[in-house]
Amino acid sequence: MHRSARWGLGAVGAGAALIVGLDLAALGEMDPFRRTISEHGLGERGWLFGLGVALLAVGSAAIGVSLARRRLAGVVGTVALLAWSAGLLVTAWFPKHDWSVGPSLSGSIHRAGSVIAFLSLPLAALIIARPWRAERHRAALAAFAFGIVAVLWVLGMGAVVMVGARSGLAWWQVMPLGLVERCLAAIEVIALTALGVWAAGKPVGLVEETSAG
């Protein structure tokens, strides 16, 4: 098992478990259907949220390094995966808007990091896994499949927002934002985990060159 991938999967698992734990601990205080995951960053457990997201980011970067070293990922795919990691680090460091006091620069930076992260991971999964579909490696196929699901999910969110805008509704009013975001996050973490399992697996053979992705 490739060491970077092994540590990466461990960090991703720990980060995801920590964030799920925060959700479970806050069930009586916060509506997960309406409140986003980043809401945890505003409370007294904010440091735990930051730690969980940072673990996800570091684990993702380690998986990206493993994929690149094994020549399973090209430059474009690796950059996309690192963009996801960078976006996560931004969301961990900068808290979201606290609407009880109004918008803030930190909240705007947090939102930008979230958008970069959520858009980059599906692209990374598709770009990295697509050239390897012929190898029929289950983890690579899973990463590609969940990458497609994530893209379709994002497109669906965009379509709903556009329909709501035509009706005069703000984007956060047209869907149960917390639920939608959590589903997207779960889909993307599954795609990431599949990439990690693929990177940690046995070599699929000597590769003379990879695609541009």
Explain the meaning of each model-derived region.
Residues 2-10, 72-83, 136-149:
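Interfacial segments of alpha-helical transmembrane regions
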Residues 29-44, 98-107, 166-177:
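Membrane-interface interhelical loops and short amphipathic "cap" helices
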Residues 63-73, 126-141:
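Juxtamembrane helix-break-helix junctions at the cytosolic face
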Residues 39-58:
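Interfacial helix-start motif at the membrane-water boundary
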Residues 130-213:
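Terminal transmembrane helical module of multi-pass membrane proteins
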Residues 13-31:
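Alpha-helical transmembrane segments of multi-pass membrane proteins
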Residues 90-135:
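Membrane-proximal helix-loop-helix units in multi-pass membrane proteins
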